[in-house]
Regions:
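Extended, low-hydrophobicity, polar/charged segments
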Residues: 1-162
């Protein structure tokens, strides 16, 4: 099954409405933003991170306009150091290549060993945008439905201030 169809199927099963925008391939949030100009909602970036020993995995979701202070995040996570997960580890854990990471990749994490962190600053917005596990599709869902999606597939999320 195509990756994006898994996303649509999961959203339909839990009655989450969404809007989809199809566009040419976009490997960065900046590229994707060019195709969704004028649409309401936070343009999110989703970062797949790991600790130094590669024994813990994190998905950090934040406004794409914001820069992440990795040292500060490592402190919050009680880790000595964090870094981006390798493309190979990302494929193994989420079934996705770089440039396509979003909360919907959690659908592919059979071990359910990724911890989810949401930046508090963006959560007052009504809508969020994500890749639909395909970099030719941007999906918009409400912030409340984002919470619902995460918990419906068996994950907890943590709200942090970045």
């Amino acid at each position: 099954m195509e990756q994006y169809l898994k996303v649509y199927d999961a959203l339909h099963k839990i009655n989450i409405p969404y809007e989809i925008v199809e566009h040419p391939p976009a490997l960065t949030t900046e590229e994707a933003d060019n195709y969704i100009v004028g649409k309401e909602g936070v343009r999110t970036k989703t970062l797949f991170l790991t600790n130094k020993k590669k024994t813990a995995y994190y998905l950090v979701i934040m406004d794409d306009a914001k820069r992440l202070d990795m040292e500060y995040l490592a402190e919050i996570l009680n880790e000595k150091r964090i870094s981006f997960g390798s493309p190979e580890r990302l494929m193994k854990k989420m079934g996705l290549p770089p440039g396509v990471v979003s909360i919907f990749g959690l659908l592919n994490n059979d071990e359910q060993d990724i911890k989810v962190y949401l930046d508090k600053e963006m959560l007052s917005e009504r809508l969020m945008s994500f890749h639909a596990n395909d970099n030719t599709k941007t999906i918009f869902i409400s912030t409340e439905d984002m919470y619902k999606f995460i918990t419906s597939i068996g994950y907890e999320y943590n709200i942090i201030e970045l």
